């Protein structure tokens, strides 16, 4: 099984997670990312996998050896401790999908995008790319624009930097 360079997260929902001996560990339920305060794309920390008994565990991306659209291959020892979301962590399927964000039009400043009905889009899917040394980052976002009169709007794939609303707000320090 070869590792895909880019994978869309919603297509992985429910995919089987296997160990090197082809025994099923569980099924993928979500992907954990770390949103950043700067304009850098979120970094993928790991997978939330549902094992026997509907128990959800965390598998770090360093243990993932291959990702395909239908299955995920992990190596090493898997810790079966129950997954608990930490502060600063964001679940892609639970928190990012169906979120309303602002689409930055070409020529518009990235931080001062005017929010209009036309520039507000809904996140439908998120693409993650493999970087060097087993690091994965969010690279592209599949969005849907608002349609007219209860119709679906146009959908398109945009780069992460072309949307506002998926980064953490910067902490302002005031001198008083």
Where are these regions (language model features)?
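Peripheral interaction segments used for macromolecular assembly
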Residues: 1-176
């Amino acid at each position: 099984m070869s590792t895909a360079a880019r994978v869309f997260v919603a297509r992985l929902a429910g995919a089987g997670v296997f160990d090197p001996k082809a025994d099923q560990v569980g099924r993928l339920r979500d992907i954990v990312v770390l949103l950043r305060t700067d304009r850098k794309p979120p970094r993928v920390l790991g997978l939330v996998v549902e094992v026997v008994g509907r128990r959800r565990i965390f598998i770090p991306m360093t243990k993932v050896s291959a990702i395909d659209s239908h299955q995920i291959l992990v190596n090493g020892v898997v810790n079966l401790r129950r997954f608990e979301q930490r502060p600063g962590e964001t679940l892609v399927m639970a928190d990012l999908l169906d979120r309303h964000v602002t689409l930055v039009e070409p020529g518009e400043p990235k931080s001062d995008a005017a929010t209009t009905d036309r520039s507000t889009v809904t996140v439908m899917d998120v693409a993650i790319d493999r970087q060097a040394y087993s690091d994965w980052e969010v690279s592209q976002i599949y969005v849907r624009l608002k349609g007219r009169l209860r119709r679906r709007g146009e959908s398109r794939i945009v780069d992460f930097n072309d949307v506002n609303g998926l980064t953490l707000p910067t902490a302002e320090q005031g001198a008083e």
